[in-house]
Amino acid sequence: MREAPHVLGIVLAGGEGKRLYPLTADRAKPAVPFGGGYRLIDFVLSNLVNARFLRICVLTQYKSHSLDRHISQNWRLSGLAGEYITPVPAQQRLGPRWYTGSADAIYQSMNLIYDEDPDYIVIFGADHVYRMDPEQMVQQHIESGAGATVAGIRVPRAEASAFGCIDSDDSGRIRGFIEKPADPPGTPDDPEQTFVSMGNYIFTTKVLIDAIRADAEDDDSDHDMGGDIIPRLVADGMAAVYDFNDNEVPGATERDHGYWRDVGTLDAFYDAHMDLVSVHPVFNLYNKRWPIRGGAENLAPAKFVNGGSAQESVVGAGSIISAASVRNSVLSSNVVIDDGAIVEGSVIMPGARIGRGAVVRHAILDKNVVVGPGEMVGVDLDKDRERFSISAGGVVAVGKGVWI
């Protein structure tokens, strides 16, 4: 039997997430709650763990306390078997400076690579919502002989200009890696589609080390994985694309096969939540064969009393809905909605309370927000604009701990 390759997982989780403000005012983007019982980082960690990649370093920097705590409490593996998921804050090993980019984060954390001495390194982002079996991508990387493999998702060519785009040949070799081009390239088999980078990479270890070292010595570099490292390897003919559409996840439905969302804006974050709530959801949280992990809390079940109801909604553990109406919404844990309140098309994060007769529509309420009796959010946007953040799509976002 062929020995399994030695793989180290590195998750880039230092992002500030300015476009998600106010949700990122007090936490790193990967720590933002999602889906009623998770945090954004749980999706990438679940994909790696489900694929049995069990040596994982999570590189953190910006306001990382809640992220570090979440990983430590909810992602404990067996140290006796050499398995670990460990948060690694920026440590200034190479001098008194923080990470200046994702490639610099790898450069300043090279000791992790030397200590583990892997054959291959999986470097994934921490802030996307999706299911993926990364082992299939690693196998293609090994078989192709590439030094680097970039996961690409197919999007309509007319929509690809907002992303980093991949130009590849019939063999999968990448000929060009172009950031937000005016005229995106088609895929080899369909000129109306474009491969867009998902921010997920596989590297042969020596190739990565050499590229990171060369980049560190380049004063003109922004020290970014997608902007500098991958183009460097493309120029050397060492990069290949992995078609995400070929990834087969156990238990996936026809509807959520190939689902991937960048939730970097308030509108995208909101829309991804709305993908969860229908009877046959666009993204199915309930796939037991490829579970999303990390959301376990020792809480009582949700409770509905005095005729309270929730339709086409996800309701987290410990929540209580009393004589209130919830529709097309996602409620996290320990949310309380009092008599006569109405919640429609909204995302409510842990510990929020919505008072008697209050109305919340088309809104995101962060943790521990209190909406007083009779108050309204998302009903009068002119009034809300004076108090809260409002997205381009009209989603009202209320920051953590605000009393209304």
From Swiss-Prot:
UniProt keywords, alphabetically: ATP-binding, Carbohydrate metabolism, Glycogen biosynthesis, Glycogen metabolism, Nucleotide-binding, Nucleotidyltransferase, Transferase
Function recorded in the entry: Involved in the biosynthesis of ADP-glucose, a building block, required in the biosynthesis of maltose-1-phosphate (M1P) and in the elongation reactions to produce linear alpha-1,4-glucans. Catalyzes the reaction between ATP and alpha-D-glucose 1-phosphate (G1P) to produce pyrophosphate and ADP-Glc.
Top-level EC class: transferase
EC number(s) reported in the record: 2.7.7.27
Protein's UniProt name: Glucose-1-phosphate adenylyltransferase
Range of residues in the leader sequence: none
Similarity comment text for this entry: Belongs to the bacterial/plant glucose-1-phosphate adenylyltransferase family.
CDD domains: ADP_Glucose_PP, LbH_G1P_AT_C
The organism's taxonomic lineage, starting at the top: Bacteria, Bacillati, Actinomycetota, Actinomycetes, Mycobacteriales
Catalytic activity: alpha-D-glucose 1-phosphate + ATP + H(+) = ADP-alpha-D-glucose + diphosphate
Keyword Transcription belongs to the record: no
The keyword Nucleotide-binding is annotated on this UniProt entry: yes
Residues that, per the record, bind alpha-D-glucose 1-phosphate: 99, 164, 179-180, 197
Pathway membership: Glycan biosynthesis; glycogen biosynthesis
PROSITE patterns: ADP_GLC_PYROPHOSPH_1, ADP_GLC_PYROPHOSPH_2, ADP_GLC_PYROPHOSPH_3
A molecular-function term among this protein's GO annotations: glucose-1-phosphate adenylyltransferase activity
Stored NCBIfam families: glgC, PRK00725.1, PRK00844.1
Domain of life: Bacteria
UniProt GO BP: glycogen biosynthetic process
